[in-house]
Amino acid sequence: MKVFYDSDFKLDALKEKTIAVIGYGSQGRAQSLNMKDSGLNVVVGLRKNGASWENAKADGHNVMTIEEAAEKADIIHILIPDELQAEVYDAQIKPYLKEGKTLSFSHGFNIHYGFIVPPKGVNVVLVAPKSPGKMVRRTYEEGFGVPGLICIEIDATNNAFDIVSAMAKGIGLSRAGVIQTTFKEETETDLFGEQAVLCGGVTELIKAGFETLVEAGYAPEMAYFETCHELKLIVDLIYQKGFKNMWNDVSNTAEYGGLTRRSRIVTADSKAAMKEILKEIQDGRFTKEFVLEKQVNHAHLKAMRRLEGELQIEEVGAKLRKMCGLEKEE
């Protein structure tokens, strides 16, 4: 898989263009500021006088309504939550799409699953930093960047690569390295990673470990330190050095115990469950479920959030994070 760097990309394709960033959350703020600081012409489209309106103005942006931004821009970069994109697109963006314009995303969800169907003659691309927005902005200001992905779903103008690669360069992604992929691959792997490992799998593993120790009579504080707090140390080692060097950096006791016991935790049944989760993503079952959840105003999600906040590990963790100076007293 080819990796592109700064010397491979040029900003030329965007020199006479206007980029409208729709949304001003973590990614919207970071990407719009980085592109603006790279000399690109950026406007920000937001709900009139919404919560982000003044924030974007304070950051020096030319702020306008979503409709005004969509009409003015050559490239419309949609960075609002997945579940809101189709509705906003249909009502406020689609009427202003003309042949030769570019529709851009940082996650392929709505294009891949067909919730947004652009008209003919419009480029459809994706540029996705592989990092939270704050890191995208901080590393750019430090003179570097974070890795990213680019995709081209529709190349109506025969220069979609030049456009999306220029956006990646403007955001600072090519300073670290950019990989070209597809909307399908980006969407399905991203959802799988979130559900099976990064957000779903890890939190359930931590919770099970914490509860096992507490139920065996150990102090909740000790259980938290050993199953949650110290996880960051191990993840940082893996992130920086890989598995092999992580094992080199921990004690022999930890290495032997981990290597000989890990397959009893993540079993063949666990991998079979992962495969089923991936199938649900691939065949659209998860997407249908998520759409139905939105239709009932996220009732199930809100209930799960409430229950998660009531867990003992949350209560113990809040106290220990304050003790460690990680979380300020309210």
Swiss-Prot record:
The active site is at H107. One of its GO terms (molecular function) is ketol-acid reductoisomerase activity. It comes from Methanococcus maripaludis (strain C7 / ATCC BAA-1331). Residues 1-181 form the KARI N-terminal Rossmann domain. It comes from the Archaea. Residues 182-327 form the KARI C-terminal knotted domain. NADP(+) binds at Y24, G25, S26, Q27, R47, S52, D82, E83, L84, Q85, G133. It is an enzyme of class 1 (oxidoreductase). Mg(2+) 2 binds at D190, E226, E230. SUPFAM superfamilies: 6-phosphogluconate dehydrogenase C-terminal domain-like, NAD(P)-binding Rossmann-fold domains. Belongs to the ketol-acid reductoisomerase family. Mg(2+) 1 binds at D190, E194. Pfam families: KARI_C, KARI_N. Involved in the biosynthesis of branched-chain amino acids (BCAA). Catalyzes an alkyl-migration followed by a ketol-acid reduction of (S)-2-acetolactate (S2AL) to yield (R)-2,3-dihydroxy-isovalerate. In the isomerase reaction, S2AL is rearranged via a Mg-dependent methyl migration to produce 3-hydroxy-3-methyl-2-ketobutyrate (HMKB). In the reductase reaction, this 2-ketoacid undergoes a metal-dependent reduction by NADPH to yield (R)-2,3-dihydroxy-isovalerate. The gene is ilvC. Its cofactor is Mg(2+). Keywords: Amino-acid biosynthesis, Branched-chain amino acid biosynthesis, Magnesium, Metal-binding, NADP, Oxidoreductase. This is Ketol-acid reductoisomerase (NADP(+)). GO terms for biological process: isoleucine biosynthetic process; L-valine biosynthetic process. The keyword Nucleus does not apply. The keyword Oxidoreductase applies. It catalyses: (2R)-2,3-dihydroxy-3-methylbutanoate + NADP(+) = (2S)-2-acetolactate + NADPH + H(+); (2R,3R)-2,3-dihydroxy-3-methylpentanoate + NADP(+) = (S)-2-ethyl-2-hydroxy-3-oxobutanoate + NADPH + H(+).
